[in-house]
């Protein structure tokens, strides 16, 4: 199966639109073998810290498990550890190691879904201006993340988190 990455996912932080918890989304994506996932909540970035921290926590646990599996494989191969079926134990440890490597390669993609006015920000003339367009923005690197943060924390008085209807 080709690798697949969701680039537009809402968490419980997308008010009235998302229900999934960050932990369950990450766990499911990793279990499905996805190499990453992008959290793009509606009009906010409230879940980004929890998302990034949870991925790092899972990766930290995997580093420890991978080190244990590598040590066990080495011990079984050189004979310092014995068991009834060393070949089966080595195969089991190699599967655990492969799963850990896959999780360690998982990429948390940081983004948001912004609202774009159809005409101009302050135009509110009936049906055409009742809803705006949605635009997905993804951070390519740390500078992109900082730019997203600036977009959402701008002190400009005309900046709105969501278009009012």
Predicted regions and their residues:
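Phosphodiester-processing cores and adjacent nucleic acid-binding clamps
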Residues: 1-154, 159
């Amino acid at each position: 199966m080709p690798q697949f990455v969701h680039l537009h996912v809402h968490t419980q932080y997308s008010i009235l639109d998302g229900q999934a918890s960050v932990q369950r989304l990450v766990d499911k994506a990793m279990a499905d073998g996805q190499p990453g996932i992008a959290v793009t909540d509606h009009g906010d970035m409230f879940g980004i810290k929890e998302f990034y921290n949870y991925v790092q926590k899972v990766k930290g646990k995997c580093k420890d498990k991978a080190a244990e599996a590598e040590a066990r494989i080495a011990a079984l191969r050189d004979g310092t550890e014995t068991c009834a079926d060393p070949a089966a134990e080595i195969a089991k440890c190699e599967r655990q190691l492969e799963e850990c490597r896959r999780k360690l390669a998982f990429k948390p993609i940081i983004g948001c879904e912004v609202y774009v006015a159809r005409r101009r920000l302050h135009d509110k003339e009936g049906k055409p201006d009742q809803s705006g367009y949605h635009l997905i923005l993804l951070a390519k690197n740390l500078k992109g993340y900082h730019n997203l943060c600036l977009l959402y924390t701008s002190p400009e008085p005309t900046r709105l988190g969501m278009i009012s209807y």
